Amino acid sequence: EITAIAWAWIRPNPIVSCYLLGESAAHDMLTAFVAAYKQADLVTGHYIRGYDLPMINGALSEYGLPVLDDKMVQDTKIDLVRRAGLSGSQENLGSMLGLHHPKVKMDQTKWRDANRLTPEGLTLARERVIGDVLQHIELRQRLLALGYLCPPSLWSSGNPHQPEAVYTP
């Protein structure tokens, strides 16, 4: 189950959209995200191809909604230059690069509170997902400036009813 979802358009002073289960119905959270996703030429996140987009597709499927369309994606974990001896976690990269936005820590107990929709848990979940978005925006900008990110690539849900998108540089 998706307890919280957040996103922002990358611009100076981004405004983060955030939805929490318990405050919004899951269907409404998903349709709001999909509407923003469809407007974007490119989406970016930390392990977004490996976790976030597949997780959202699972939730969309559970609610009988169409899965996500193909999209150009830049993933600050998967698209990070090859390296050894260095964790690729967003928290570690943020610390190493001295980012202004810190990683909001949530251990399993705090996530369980959020998943149980307790007021305290939802407050923490909101802080976490908004913090993740803001830190990610800063992280991506820094990684791009340093030349540490590979180019975006096409992500596909594998939807057989959607014509395959073709990327032409």
Language-model segment annotations:
Residues 1-12:
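Acidic, metal-ligating active-site segments
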Residues 4-6, 34, 108, 152:
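Intrinsically disordered regions, especially transient/low-confidence alpha-helical propensity segments
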Residues 93-163:
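Acidic, Mg2+-coordinating catalytic module of metal-dependent nucleases/exonucleases
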